[in-house]
């Protein structure tokens, strides 16, 4: 998923599997000391959750050339990344049935906040922001009722969960 599209490109989408294959190889090669230079040359940034060689989990931000810009550590396996273009923050969501989402600076890799799903819910790994950046939406599972919901979060209030709506399905995965 594009994190910072070039103004002329209107966003760049890559086939996830092809991107992850290349991104994984670049990540295993290790973090370079030239991430600032990679950022300056980048027209777009991409995020991917990964398992590191030591078995720990992380999320890496890459340029379209495959250069690592930043990484953030995750407590468990992550899935997808959403980007807030207003605040220039990213959120990586836990892969189901995990309950965390990490808000971070995609340029520095600094963790800014850790979110936890409410009781009775887990994240399905995806989310997105409203066009004005005021709200974040996350795909979630209401496992007692066995159906999917979209959780609604107030970004300005520290990502406070303010509601939800039914996704009309059991396994809400990606939402656009």
Where are these regions (language model features)?
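Short, solvent-exposed loop/turn segments at conserved positions within beta-propeller repeat blades
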Residues: 52-55, 95-97, 143-148
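A short beta-strand motif characteristic of beta-propeller blades
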Residues: 67-73, 110-117, 160-165
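Residue-level detector of Asp-centered blade-edge/turn motifs that repeat once per structural unit
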Residues: 85-86, 131-132
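C-terminal segment of N-terminal export signals and the immediately downstream linker at the start
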Residues: 13, 31-62
